[in-house]
Design a protein with these regions (language model features):
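N-terminal carbohydrate-binding accessory modules
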Residues: 1-49, 79, 741
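Substrate-binding cleft/loops of secretory-pathway carbohydrate-active enzymes
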Residues: 152-183, 188-230, 236, 301-307, ...
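Aromatic-lined ligand-binding clefts that engage carbohydrates, nucleic acids, or primary amines
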Residues: 653-675, 705-706
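Aromatic-lined substrate-binding rim segments of carbohydrate-active enzymes
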Residues: 35-102, 176
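The substrate-binding groove and active-site-proximal loops of carbohydrate-active enzymes
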Residues: 20-32, 55-74, 110-129, 150-165, ...
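Carbohydrate-binding surfaces of carbohydrate-active enzymes
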Residues: 112, 124-136, 143-145, 154, ...
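Aromatic- and acidic-residue-enriched segments that line the glycan-binding/catalytic groove
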Residues: 64-72, 94-121, 125, 129-135, ...
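Glycoside hydrolase catalytic-domain groove-lining segments
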Residues: 196-266, 280, 320-322, 326, ...
């Protein structure tokens, strides 16, 4: 039986350090029929733990009327996580935040007049009743690894000091008395929040859409290597951040709210990239973090309320307005399950953590000092994010082994380029020097030194970042420099395989196939009986590759299922060592031609043709078969512009297995989609093409698109500006249909 514990450095499994990856996914913000596939996606992207809130208002919107059915069915969600061997970190509140109405408190609770978030007996009685309902959902499941009590308590509301500590202890005791059990019990620790004897988890975001500023924010400190774990800017719309209420050195550095993206607000709309999240994550790794936990990892859509909408808004006392429905969060997996470039970026770190986490967890950060030859060398803890010329570097090591981290990325700002940098590390056996290289703006990476390949072979250095290994024989690295290394002995049965960063992001590791590394620009998921590729008509790819350990894996099984052995190793791989120990196979994918497109202006009526042949959509001229019409509705006297979208589908279309995404390229304040008079989707403009799953809504044949005008002088911070005409914009630039299907491998 697995035994989980904790020490002052890391989480432990059977007395060995572990470095898990955790991603937030709110089950009640996703339709129940989609849960299993979305769990499989998170597993494929390298997540080990799914964190989720249990929003009180989602389950008891009306006092005494509990709802744990449909997309609120917590028990079924937990059983699916269990099925796919995913742990769960349950955030039971009672207060949550999560951009939910009242922070997750039902309206009726606020009207009671009780002293909420305190030891008020009347309040605690209602908490106990709610938690007992949650516990009934938890009973019979075996996947809960951690439980978080409250959220941002003593920082965003709640009591401070001794009274706050006492309340957190009261809640923890209540939960355990009810019957909740978990190896780990946590509380958010940033901003001066109190713990009540719980383990603190930290956070950090690349931007602050809750900030009142309507300008670009100063350089973010989350892009520094630093001993500072506290991001006091989180929740600064409620209260200014304060110093930590605990001794950070007494606890491992664990995160639960590294922003996988950010949720845009009406007044502030950052546009997040994969590199924004990747560079921030590398800085946390270098600074000593031993659990990367992302909020959000999977976006969602707010459920429909019985009495009101369920989003945070200024109308109910919040400081920000967010979309009524969309909780996309620009997350690694988007609100309709689209796997983004951010997910692929973070997958680089999950593969590293899974294969090297045990030793990495016991390595401590040591700041650069004299370990670098550069135009500017830092000699201590990094504090000034506004210094864009400083060379940011740190080593994380145990004795003479470790990793050298470099970050020359600062979201929204240009860092100075550093020419001919020789990275150096001091060890007991002398200085380790890496080949000179230019560190350009936007670069971030980490290199190993004294990297153990076997009992006999150590890489003294290599100018590549470790990705993963297979059976400690095939060692995969990536980087944009040509691979160079120094080993203390000749490679014996060891193979070093390097690739550039793009191909590394195409790597997929399946728990079902531990001796194989898959390569595909398209997502690869495990199924109950094998694997499948998620193909899209706008992301063409000719083939997939696998690399396996030829000494333990039988290639014949794969060849019998359509995989082919190429004559030479593909040119995206650079191999050092005995290549006979590796087997490379490729598989041709069904070609995906151009997606269906409809381009139109405000006054034109255009047809969007959807035609299907051999499971693929093609662009087609206007004919008598399947079409989607888009036409403008008279907007005279209205403060919005509307369009009717009429769609018909090919009869051969397999709705059970395939999907169509409606891509809407608009420039306006916000867009809304209506089906049969009911709003089903919405989005604030940030500069991205908006994607909506038509399968989610049972492939509707008619939709209404509504756009609201954006004025150039509106009090809104836009990172990406639209095209204004006479100080105004409210236009539909383009609309397309993208076909998605799965191919079994």
């Amino acid at each position: 039986m697995e035994k989980y514990s904790i020490n002052g450095v890391s989480l432990l499994k059977n007395e060995k350090a572990i470095f898990p990856m955790m991603g937030e996914f709110h089950f009640s913000r996703c339709p129940e029929p989609e849960w299993e596939e979305e769990i499989r996606k998170m597993r494929a992207c390298g997540m080990d733990i799914i964190a989720t809130y249990v929003f009180w208002i989602h389950h008891e919107e009306e006092e005494g009327v509990f709802d744990f059915t449909g997309q609120r069915n917590l028990h079924y969600f937990l059983k699916l996580c269990e099925k796919w061997q995913m742990h769960v970190w349950l955030r039971i509140g009672p207060w949550a935040h999560g951009e939910a109405r009242n922070g997750g408190f039902p309206d009726w609770l606020l009207k009671k007049g009780y002293k909420l978030r305190s030891d008020d007996p009347d309040y605690l009685a209602l908490v106990e009743r709610f938690w007992k309902k949650i516990y009934k959902e938890v009973e019979g499941t075996h996947c809960i690894l951690g439980i978080q009590i409250e959220n941002e308590y003593g920082h965003v509301g709640g009591l401070r000091g001794a009274a706050g500590e006492q309340h957190m202890c009261t809640l923890t005791k209540l939960a355990k008395t009810i019957g909740f059990e978990a190896p780990y019990w946590t509380a958010t620790g940033w901003g001066g929040a109190v713990l009540g004897d719980l383990t603190p988890v930290m956070g950090g975001y690349c931007d602050a859409p809750w900030d009142a500023s309507l300008k670009q924010l100063p350089p973010n400190k989350n892009y520094l290597f630093s001993t500072v774990r506290n991001d006091g800017n989180i929740g600064s719309d409620y209260a200014p951040g304060m110093e930590l209420s605990f001794d950070k050195d007494a606890y491992p550095y664990l995160t639960a709210e590294l922003g996988g993206g950010v949720q845009v607000t009406h007044h502030r709309r950052p546009r997040v990239t994969a590199e924004d999240i990747g560079a921030m994550s590398v800085c946390k790794l270098g600074s000593g973090c031993n659990l990367l936990g992302y909020y959000m990892y999977h976006g969602g859509i707010n459920p429909k309320g019985k009495l009101s909408s369920l989003q945070e808004s200024t109308a109910v006392g919040s400081f920000c307005d967010v979309p009524e429905l969309s909780y996309d969060f620009q997350a690694p997996i988007r609100e309709y399950g689209q796997i983004s470039e951010t997910a692929k970026e973070l997958k680089l770190l999950s593969m590293f953590a899974h294969d090297y986490g045990e030793t990495f967890c016991n390595m401590q950060p040591q700041f650069a000092g004299d370990d670098c030859e550069s135009t500017s060398v830092h000699t201590g803890d990094f504090q000034d994010a506004e210094d864009l010329s400083e060379f940011r570097m740190i080593t994380r090591r145990s004795g003479d082994r470790g990793y050298l981290f470099v970050n020359n990325y600062q979201r929204g700002y240009e860092m100075a380029e550093h020419k001919d940098v020789m990275l150096r590390v001091q060890t007991a056996d002398g200085e380790i020097s890496f080949p000179k290289q230019d560190i350009k703006n936007g670069a971030y990476f980490f290199y190993p030194f004294n990297f153990l390949l076997s009992d006999d072979v150590t890489l003294r250095w290599i100018n590549q970042t470790p990705l993963c290994n297979i059976n400690r024989k095939l060692w995969f690295f990536y980087g944009n420099e040509k691979m160079q290394y120094e080993a203390d002995e000749k490679l014996s049965g060891q193979v070093l395989i390097s690739m550039d960063r793009i191909w590394a992001k195409y790597a997929w590791r399946m728990k079902k196939y531990p001796n194989i590394l898959f390569f595909s620009a398209l997502p690869i998921l495990e199924t109950e009986n094998g694997i499948e590729v998620i193909c899209r008509s706008d992301r063409a790819q000719k083939n997939c590759w696998i690399i396996m350990d030829a000494t333990v894996e039988d290639a014949k099984t794969w060849i019998d299922n359509g995989w082919k052995k190429p004559d030479i190793i593909p040119d995206f791989l650079h191999v050092e060592g005995d290549a006979s120990t590796i087997c490379v196979l490729s598989h041709d994918l069904t070609a995906a031609d151009n997606q269906t497109v409809a381009s139109f202006t405000h006054t034109d009526v255009n047809n969007c043709i959807i035609r299907k042949e051999k499971n693929v959509f093609h662009r087609a001229e206007k004919t008598d078969f399947s079409e989607a019409e888009v036409c403008a509705i008279d907007d005279t006297g209205k403060d919005y512009q509307e369009y009717v979208i009429r769609i018909s589908y090919d009869k051969a279309y397999d709705a059970a297995k395939e999907n169509i995404f409606l891509q809407i390229d608009f420039q306006a304040d916000q867009a809304e989609l209506y089906l049969n008079g009911e709003k089903i989707a919405d989005q604030y403009y940030i500069g991205d093409v908006w994607e909506v799953s038509l399968k989610r809504f049972d492939f509707p044949t008619e939709l209404i698109l509504r756009l609201y005008p954006l004025e150039e002088d509106d009090k809104i911070y836009l990172e990406t500006q639209p095209d204004y005409v006479n100080g105004r914009c409210c236009s539909l630039k383009d609309i397309r249909c993208v076909y998605e299907y799965k191919e079994k491998l």
